[in-house]
Amino acid sequence: MAKVIGIDLGTTNSCVAVMEGGEPIVIANPEGNRTTPSVVAFSKTGERMTGQVAKRQAITNPERTIISIKRDMGTDHKVDIDGKKFSPQEISSMILQKLKSDAEAYLGETVTQAVITVPAYFSDAQRQATKDSGKIAGLEVLRIINEPTAAALAYGLDKEHDQKIMVYDLGGGTFDVSILEIGDGVFEVLATNGNNKLGGDDFDQRIIDFLVDTFKKESGIDLKNDKMAMQRLKEAAEKAKVELSGVTSSNINLPFITADASGPKHLDVTLTRAKFDEITADLVENTMVPTRQAMQDAGLTPDKIDKILLVGGSTRIPAVQEAVKKYLGKDPFKGINPDECVAVGAAIQAGVLTGDVTGLLLLDVTPLSLGLETLGGVFTKLIERNTTIPTKKSQVFSTAADGQTSVEIHVLQGEREMAQYNKSLGRFQLTGIPSAPRGVPQIEVTFDIDANGIVHVSAKDLGTGNEQKITITASTNLSDSDIDKAVKEAEKFAAEDKQRKEEIDVRNNADSLIYQSEKSLKDLGDKVSADDKSKIESGVNKVKDALKGTDIEVIKKATEELQQSFYDISSKIYQQTQGAQSDPGAAGFGGQQEAPGAGQDENVVDADYKVVDDDK
């Protein structure tokens, strides 16, 4: 059976894993790293870069480098590169393609299916957008799974006794907290909460703001409008944040950060952990609000939690760990890798779907209440938040006016009492209702949430049996034709990448042959005739001229001709050497002399022998 990979599609970093021999294995990328930066960039010549290579060039190419695109999933945001507009789904698909390619290189086979994780607090539109990204990347997304739940799978796969655990997941761009009960292979989510606009990026931004303000006070120069300087500050801020998890102060030194009439300016600031904690204190507290709400929704007190799992790189921040410890009264469990455990959990879920992992049942929940707008702009909930999915719920409504022959079903997601303050998922019409006084027609609305957390809604006139069904697609989601177009674009990019690689291989091969030919001529010296030497030199010059151009076929042809000339001359020299070896009197290059005693076999006597055992 073909392998199904598990992917943690993160805001700042992504990770891919697979089940092998019953164990989840994290797949390293070609650079040798087990996580890949979620960065996409386009060079000025239009070449696409993804991952570490894209991140490395961000300082010199900030306007054409896309970071943290996950924060824009499910929105109508567009990235403009040379007049071409890319949706968040398309940019995310490029990251997924990179992970898919790395997995294929590791496995030695084509990968077409995946389980992809999303923040637990992702809306329906964001989940649908993630699924679309997978499709564009050439992946059938078998399941969308919540990140905290995936982390719990990674932790609890081999745990048999019952435990109540909290997964506190602070990633690069999102925050989630889930309360689960696990035991005997059953993983039941009791409650989940979160904030899709809170993550490590925000901690970085506080450091950037601090550096900008400090530099402005010292030099009078505002760096905010200098994109290259801001990119350098971003990298330095991220590095300082990481350092402050292990030391109490970090020196941020950026020479030549900018210049004015008096000359170049340098930034040199020392950031202490105490100052970092001070400027980010509200961010840490903002993670505790959903944490307390999730505990309340689960009906648990802190003493009932057996284990706290910290997930996401930002949970290494000491102030974050201290806040969690203070609230729950116990140290977090540190036996899982916060950067890899989500991908590992996704791989385990993939194993469940393929049958590689058995005896495991996952019961997840919907993070937000679902319902529709009713008379007066009220939000009427059909499915409450933290309901176990998949689930289905129906409720009967009626018309609001006499003679009404159609109704608009406005589907929403959220917790506010009034419809306008909740997230609109979509609208559809149920028509053909017989004219009747208001309140008489019976319209049954059914909400169905699948295991991916994606919503399907139907409305049925019980009087006529007339029914209308839709899978919710927000206005920000891509249509089927948009997805098909994006798939073709992705295939085109893949073909261009392949062609570019082939071009590099052809050029490298030509360079190698030039070096080999020139070295051989030098080493062989007089053994090569003047005509043959001239032929090789002519071929070398022809390849060098071809390399100056852009026509790959010309380079290939010149390389093949030089290769043939090289083979012909090598063969000729080999034959000459063999001829010298076969000359009986030759004792020169490759010649042989007769060994002493050779041919004197007349008086040879075969000696008898026996083995003597000294122990006897």
Swiss-Prot record:
The modification Phosphothreonine is found at T174. GO terms for molecular function: ATP binding; ATP-dependent protein folding chaperone; unfolded protein binding. The lineage of its organism: Bacteria, Bacillati, Bacillota, Clostridia, Eubacteriales. Residues 575-616 are annotated as: Disordered. InterPro entries: ATPase_NBD, Chaperone_DnaK, Heat_shock_70_CS, HSP70_C_sf, HSP70_peptide-bd_sf, Hsp_70_fam. It comes from Ruminiclostridium cellulolyticum (strain ATCC 35319 / DSM 5812 / JCM 6584 / H10). Acts as a chaperone. CDD domains: ASKHA_NBD_HSP70_DnaK-like. The keyword DNA repair does not apply. Signal peptide: none annotated. It comes from the Bacteria. Keywords: ATP-binding, Chaperone, Nucleotide-binding, Phosphoprotein, Stress response. PROSITE patterns: HSP70_1, HSP70_2, HSP70_3. Residues 607-616 have a biased composition (Basic and acidic residues). Belongs to the heat shock protein 70 family. Induction: By stress conditions e.g. heat shock. This is Chaperone protein DnaK. Gene3D superfamilies: 1.20.1270.10, 3.30.420.40, Actin, Chain A, domain 4, Substrate Binding Domain Of DNAk, Chain A, domain 1.
